[in-house]
């Protein structure tokens, strides 16, 4: 995941790596042993009473300086050209497209019966349900990763609700309420499926 990447048109990607909180010693130890490329930096989220992913993303947002804000989870394995595709797609989309959602699937579908169930669920969701919602013009409830926003749109809709643990679906509906569309990106990010009950 921490491979040096750049977008199309010669524009560098600035990636902000955020541990869940200052007390996240496991992530801090892993990052201490990792040499980050120049375009990546670590933003440590201070401890607080609310300890959610959306709170951490809201905290990190002011440190991001790009026109496009993307979200990846630590275990994600996006294809090497995914960021290129995001830039090209946003350049070709009208301004009312505020977000691109990549497909998600798993790199360990054969780990257990449970992981196979998750794989079938994601395949159905990203290959059938979301395209059907898009074709009908209905709001797209976003996945929490491999999702990319125009920065100005994200700011306009109020970014993430720090108290909502389904912040991704909430933000997808809020984008629609503000008149923005979500388009689906033909690119699949693999992540780890739960394999133990």
Say what each PLM segment does.
Residues 2-49, 90-91:
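Acidic donor-binding segment of Leloir-type glycosyltransferases
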Residues 35-66, 80-165, 176:
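Long helical/loop segments within the catalytic core of UDP-sugar-dependent glycosyltransferases
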Residues 144, 184, 191-196:
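Catalytic cores of eukaryotic secretory-pathway lumenal/extracellular enzymes that build
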Residues 10-12, 137, 179:
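Glycine-centered short loops/turns at secondary-structure junctions
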Residues 72-74:
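Active-site acidic Asp-centered loop
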Residues 172-190:
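Catalytic donor-sugar/metal-binding loop of nucleotide-sugar-dependent glycosyltransferases
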Residues 165-171:
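Acidic donor-binding loop at a coil-to-helix junction in glycosyltransferase catalytic cores
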Residues 69:
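Short aromatic/hydrophobic "clamp" motif used to bind/position activated sugar donors
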